[in-house]
């Protein structure tokens, strides 16, 4: 589970409230399924979705959430827009500035194929409108629960169907007067004047309505007793236990409602939350048994900081930012009313949770959201390890074949299984009386069937390698068998290279050299025997050997490692990428132990070594001449203040087989890159050095763009590219295209064949129905998968002065998915994006510094 996927919903602080609960505030709203029994917080204690002023722990019970217009606690729809960053992209209309695709952005080449997708139309009754009201209180009432309770005393006026976030009220009807005044009374007898002012009548397609639909849908999921974790909803009452790995899976769904080409539609996909059946305290205890006592606290911090935990008392997720060893469950904190309470007593009263270990430290989670517009950050959340479950998988689990195999049985769904699970959710919506009543009250309904439409399958590519041309089976998108034994396009001789190994791996080292001698002749690589260097199995010994033996004549260093210990790998890569710039190849010895795969592994190692020294493997036909292709991706370096590293990779020849690579560091909190101008200028110089002329087109594939950052990209990064191109020289005015690449999409596509659903073939393009009318965008399914459902990639052309037709952009994009030299097949994104990802990952994970620029013309990071 990646960091960007973890959206934690922690609410705003609320103090003690004296409310006479009347109307909807007094009881459960009609139509809701009663929540499971849960200890309700006592009045005056911490309530709400997350934290109290200053100190914090806790969240409101489900019944309380439903009292306050369920769903609107998570997202305010004030004029400034909602909190979910992806909605900020709604107002970015880039297509209107692209004259050549204003009329049509669809291509026509390829074979027509029938597809269906996990989208369902949302329909509304004729002349439907949403009425938005602003609510004022005199005197001012700060607490949202109190404001809601006072307003809902007048349910006879506003009606049973309403949505209120504390300031903005939405109704499916228009009140008689534009301004309506009513009076309410608090529990202590204070009279409050409430002014209800109509501010907007919203059509179904307005951005505010789109946000509203999503909130209403989340309300429906709560009615069905699904539990929100981050942005998604899960069913804790239907867990899947994997006891032999101490894991639990909660099945659930991702959902979003957006305006697509012709309809407003719900996109929903299956999601799975992987939890561990051990608490953080269990984890700490097990670690204590394996660690020296004086290193225990350091080791715990190293293992836990950055992880996401789930609180067992209210199913909220938090990121562990620190561990406070000076506090324990007996420590006290100050509540909103000024009184002090210990964690022990607080959890006993608030959640009926008994803490047994009174010496455990306290976990600290820093908030990310401020209180209101321009508000201050609330205090940190203080969590008890005993009451928190670990989530996600450790690196050890991810590298355990059996763990991943057992997980895949439940999480890797075929198209038909995925359609069945999504269909179950839609069936529940149509069959649940409470859900249907809610939808009827708002005048909304959903289609019952998956959306069907036509896509296109692009022509498969021919692979050129060493003067020969190969076809491959498009169903598998892999040409490793077809090209085996064929010479490469460009090879680098292995004349002067080192092989560093430990004594216990002497046999593996000799075996590797013998097998390399067997596989390299067919590739056209001339190879001499390596300089063999035996070292102790310590990081310092490897570094000492590198310092003593690597010279300016050394072409590449191969390090045979006993294990995949990160510290040793990092030290080797850091030295050879920065202090002594030399291509390097690290090999874990056990991968050479299986006789049935040893030749295939030796082949892969030889190919990687050739690439890292500057060789070229294969190519496809690239009709677009004088075009430089750029790929950009970002990685967050958690060890360096969580700053970002952007990998920048650009082609420097017309065949797009040679690449220039740089990286840029960016301060914390910024994903967009300031230093791209320097990278692009350097790439243009590298192109000029190889070709003696400048490219007439620059096409940028921009990956690593987070939700809500599209506007910044359009307004800031694109002008930076344009300024850079202008600064190259008078009269130089190449055409620029910028395409945003997005892998994390919830859309899934299924090919219809003989009454069954299956994965679309590689090369399937979708540019109708489920694309966005305000964007020049399309999907491509480029890769093949052996199991489960294939994931498409979304491409959004945000700037384009090329004048190229949609067919040409789509075909170029698909071609570029064929030239990633670490895999003899089609990958999910264009090769420069994957190269940029590999570079940024290496720098962020291992090097933490800018690599030496003398390596920039080689794929040293593969």
Swiss-Prot record:
SUPFAM superfamilies: PAZ domain, Ribonuclease H-like. A motif (D-box) lies at residues 218-225. Ubiquitinated by the anaphase promoting complex/cyclosome (APC/C) in late spermatids, leading to its degradation. Ubiquitination only takes place following piRNA-binding in adult testis. Ubiquitination and degradation in late spermatogenesis by APC/C is probably required to release RNF8 from the cytoplasm and promote histone to protamine exchange by RNF8. Expressed in brain. Expressed in testis, specifically in spermatocytes (at protein level). Only detected in germ lineage cells of adult testis. Expressed in male gonads 2 weeks after birth at the initiation of spermatogenesis, but not expressed in female gonads. Its EC number is 3.1.26.-. Residues 1-48 are annotated as: Disordered. It comes from the Eukaryota. Residues 556-848 form the Piwi domain. Residues 317-319 are annotated as: Required for binding 2'-O-methylated 3'-end of piRNAs. Residues 1-13 have a biased composition (Basic residues). Residues 279-392 form the PAZ domain. The record marks 382 as: Required for binding 2'-O-methylated 3'-end of piRNAs. Signal peptide: none annotated. GO terms for biological process: meiotic cell cycle; piRNA-mediated gene silencing by mRNA destabilization; primary piRNA processing; regulation of cytoplasmic translation; regulatory ncRNA-mediated gene silencing; sperm DNA condensation; spermatid development; spermatogenesis. Keywords: Cytoplasm, Developmental protein, Differentiation, Endonuclease, Hydrolase, Magnesium, Meiosis, Metal-binding, Methylation, Nuclease, RNA-binding, RNA-mediated gene silencing, Spermatogenesis, Translation regulation, Ubl conjugation. Belongs to the argonaute family. Piwi subfamily. Endoribonuclease that plays a central role in postnatal germ cells by repressing transposable elements and preventing their mobilization, which is essential for the germline integrity. Acts via the piRNA metabolic process, which mediates the repression of transposable elements during meiosis by forming complexes composed of piRNAs and Piwi proteins and governs the methylation and subsequent repression of transposons. The D-box (destruction box) acts as a recognition signal for association with the APC/C complex, ubiquitination and degradation. PANTHER family: EUKARYOTIC TRANSLATION INITIATION FACTOR 2C. This is Piwi-like protein 1. It comes from Mus musculus (Mouse).
